[in-house]
Structure formats: C-alpha cells, structure tokens
C-alpha cells in the first residue's frame, strides 16, 4: 500500500502541535541484556560528555608543525541522558581544536543547537520535518560554510570561530528533501553531490550544489520503494546509488517503533549508476547479491567499468 506524507501524518496521530513519531534511526544492533556486557556506547571512551566546555592556550606535548594551521573538528552522537537504545542516537556534539603557528589555541565541545536538543531522540521527525534531526553524523565545509550533517534532515551551519550554531541551512529554501550525511565534493569542479531519501515519493532525490554553495540541480529518481540509504559513491563522471533490502515498515512506524525499518531478503538489492549530467531515464540498475552497505570507501572508472569499494554485510540482522 502506498502512503503519501499527509496520510501518514493522519495515521500516526499528528496534529498541528504534535510531535510523537518514532525516529528513523534506532537500534541497528542487538542490545545487550546482561549486566556483564553493558552497551559499549555507555562506558569507557564512548561514555557521553555531560556538559559543553571550552579551554584556551592548551598545553602541547611534543611539537605541532607550524605549517599545520586551521580547525580540526569532529561530530558524533552524545547521549546526555545515558539511556539511548543505540549508539547512533544522541544529540550531535562537536569537538574542535584550533591550531595556529604551532600552538593549540583552543578546544571546544558544543552541541549542535537543533530544535530537538535535550529532547527524547525517538521524537525525531526526520524526513517529515527536516529541521528536526539530531545532526550527529558528520561535517563538511563547502561554499564558505561549515555544515553539520545528520542521517535524515537538513544541515546546520556552524560558526568555525567558536562552534556555535548559526542556523538551519536549506540552501536558501531550495532544498526540499533531507540531505545525506556523506556528500561528495568533485575535486575538479568543486561541485558538491548529495542525495536525500524519504519514506514517501519521491523516495530518492539527487542534488548538486556548485562551488559557491548554490543548489543547482534536484533530480527525483525512481526506486522500487522506501529504502534506507546511508551513503553513495561518486566517480569522475557518475554517481552510484544503493537500493538495499532495509526497507521502511509502515506498520512499525504506526506503533512508534524506534526503528521503523525491516530487513526484507526478498526486496531488491541493486546499485544504480547515473551520469552526473544525466536525467532520471539515464539511470542503469545492476542487481547484486543480497547484502547491506553502510559506507563506501572509493569509486573509480576503469575503461567501461565502474568500480566501487565498500564495506559489505551479508545481512544487517
């Protein structure tokens, strides 16, 4: 059965002021149920940071090359409550170090100031309201902006001087889908290539933003159904999408399941190759053995072939 966005909101019990749909991100792994094996994201080096912090004029052991200047910053989920069901969940926290002329000028840990900061992560609206995402996966610098990215939603612009959040960024109102947390920048043109997936048609949209950050192309693409797409690949002339058998489950979503996707071994498993300057009809799909892929590492062209290097799972569950 096909559902559009309005019908889904009605079935999920949404009103104008309601926000109670489950997250598009939940447990992708089996939870530990023994005291001897606590969830690894709650202990040790993965233990959540309990507050934002800042320090200046940091002590350096050894020497930092004076030519190494700039900002090193990372993003990741920080479960301030310490109760999340999966390590993918947790408000996005940025950790950054500013290096200048052999000195470590400052370190800061700052939350991405999203509309759902300090709220239950299972209330993430994802593709339904793209600004309501935890923005906790990665960052990219493009078009003079530093952007914090999440699994399903819009980016947030970050101030590189202090890691504060400037604004939600939707490319001047042009972006009408979520944005992947793994965009690719063409080193020859400066063009940023990315996609957004959705649980409603169009299930997949391919985007291009030029070197200045202007969104110049948004191309809806036909897929078999709503599938989870975390990453994609890019070569000099092509982009490669992966439609894999982790698919959206309306029945799970309506019961507020924290992860309304299921493994369906009978679903399509294929890669789609599209010329960067192509139209939807130019997509070529190639069936592959049943598997799931979170991340690609590299892609390139060799004669008439397109080669993709990726981490492959025989099954997600």
Walk through the language-model features, giving the residues of each:
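A conserved active-site cap/scaffold subdomain adjacent to cofactor or substrate pockets
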Residues: 266-317
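Beta-propeller blade signature
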Residues: 205-211, 256-278
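C-terminal segment of N-terminal export signals and the immediately downstream linker at the start
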Residues: 23-62
């Amino acid at each position: 059965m096909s559902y559009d966005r309005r019908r889904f909101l009605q079935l999920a019990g949404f009103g104008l002021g309601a926000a109670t749909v489950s997250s598009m991100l939940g447990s992708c792994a089996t939870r530990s149920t023994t005291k001897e094996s606590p969830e690894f994201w709650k202990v040790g080096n993965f233990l959540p940071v309990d507050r934002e912090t800042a320090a200046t004029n940091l002590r350096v052991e050894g020497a930092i090359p004076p030519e190494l200047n700039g900002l090193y910053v990372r993003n990741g989920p920080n479960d301030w409550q310490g109760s999340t069901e999966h390590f993918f969940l947790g408000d996005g926290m940025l950790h950054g170090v500013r290096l200048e002329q052999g000195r470590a000028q400052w370190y800061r840990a700052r939350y991405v100031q999203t509309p759902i900061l300090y709220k239950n992560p299972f209330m993430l609206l994802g593709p339904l309201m793209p600004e309501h995402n935890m923005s906790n996966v990665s960052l990219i610098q493009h078009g003079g902006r530093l952007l914090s990215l999440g699994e399903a939603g819009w980016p947030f612009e970050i101030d590189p001087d202090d890691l504060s959040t400037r604004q939600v960024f939707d490319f001047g109102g042009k972006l009408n889908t979520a944005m992947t947390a793994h965009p690719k920048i063409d080193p020859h043109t400066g063009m940023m290539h990315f996609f957004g997936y959705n649980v409603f048609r169009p299930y997949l949209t391919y985007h291009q933003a030029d070197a200045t950050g202007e969104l110049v192309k948004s191309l809806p693409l036909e897929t078999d159904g709503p599938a989870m797409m975390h990453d994609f690949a890019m070569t000099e002339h092509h982009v490669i999408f992966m439609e894999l058998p982790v698919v959206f489950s309306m029945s799970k979503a309506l019961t507020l399941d924290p992860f309304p996707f299921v493994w369906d071994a009978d679903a399509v498993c294929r890669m789609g190759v599209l010329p960067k300057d192509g139209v939807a009809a130019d997509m070529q799909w190639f069936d592959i053995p049943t598997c799931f892929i979170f991340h690609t590492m590299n892609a390139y062209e060799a004669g008439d072939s397109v080669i993709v290097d990726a981490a492959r799972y025989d099954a997600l569950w």
